[in-house]
Amino acid sequence: MALRDSFNKIISYFDTDEVSEVEEPAVASVKRQQDAAQPASQQQKAQSHQYHQSASRPSQQQVQSGQNRRSGEENIHSLPTRRQSHNQQPAQEKTTIALKLPRKYEDAEEIVDLLIRNECVLIDFQYMLEAQARRCLDFIDGASKVLAGNLQKVGASMYLLTPINVIVDAEEMTLAANGQDVSFNYDMKRR
């Protein structure tokens, strides 16, 4: 029975027939959570005031652990730091756009390597099976979040992956769609 459930879960992961379901009950539950969060936020304010009073006198252990933590954090670059470093670079660099037609999942690593080198990548999944294209797109989207990149859908099976220093004017794409929904979508169904 457990094996059967495992297969059903795997199959349902790839199933896209239920994509158009409306999530109205979720909106109602969010409103209830917001109403319940208002009295809780007043309690949190009182607790945070008490915490700040006790935290104003750090102990010797807290000071030492903070120093150890800072030495380890020197090697870690946060996302805002990466963005600032890209904004400070001179604009004389030329941006290149690579066109990739992945045929297997392993090609996604090559696409991410191009993003690491600050190159734009236009990806067309027309030569991949739908399931492989979804997995590849998941990997690329995750890598773009980590590397502060941007992934936008520009066609039925085409996506544009850009580094942080490239701005894409998506306004023209929405005008060309003539009322069609062009929001980001992982579904690669071809009609």
Curated annotation (Swiss-Prot):
<feature type="region of interest" description="Disordered">
    <location>
        <begin position="21"/>
        <end position="96"/>
    </location>
</feature>
<comment type="subunit">
    <text>Homodimer. Interacts with FtsZ.</text>
</comment>
<comment type="function">
    <text>Cell division protein that is part of the divisome complex and is recruited early to the Z-ring. Probably stimulates Z-ring formation, perhaps through the cross-linking of FtsZ protofilaments. Its function overlaps with FtsA.</text>
</comment>
<feature type="compositionally biased region" description="Polar residues">
    <location>
        <begin position="86"/>
        <end position="95"/>
    </location>
</feature>
<dbReference type="GO" id="GO:0043093">
    <property type="term" value="P:FtsZ-dependent cytokinesis"/>
</dbReference>
<feature type="compositionally biased region" description="Low complexity">
    <location>
        <begin position="25"/>
        <end position="56"/>
    </location>
</feature>
<keyword id="KW-0132">Cell division</keyword>
<dbReference type="InterPro" id="IPR023052">
    <property type="entry name" value="Cell_div_SepF"/>
</dbReference>
<dbReference type="GO" id="GO:0000917">
    <property type="term" value="P:division septum assembly"/>
</dbReference>
<keyword id="KW-0963">Cytoplasm</keyword>
<dbReference type="GO" id="GO:0005737">
    <property type="term" value="C:cytoplasm"/>
</dbReference>
<comment type="similarity">
    <text>Belongs to the SepF family.</text>
</comment>
<protein>
    <recommendedName>
        <fullName>Cell division protein SepF</fullName>
    </recommendedName>
</protein>
<feature type="compositionally biased region" description="Polar residues">
    <location>
        <begin position="57"/>
        <end position="69"/>
    </location>
</feature>
<dbReference type="Pfam" id="PF04472">
    <property type="entry name" value="SepF"/>
</dbReference>
<keyword id="KW-0717">Septation</keyword>
<keyword id="KW-0131">Cell cycle</keyword>
<dbReference type="InterPro" id="IPR007561">
    <property type="entry name" value="Cell_div_SepF/SepF-rel"/>
</dbReference>
<dbReference type="InterPro" id="IPR038594">
    <property type="entry name" value="SepF-like_sf"/>
</dbReference>
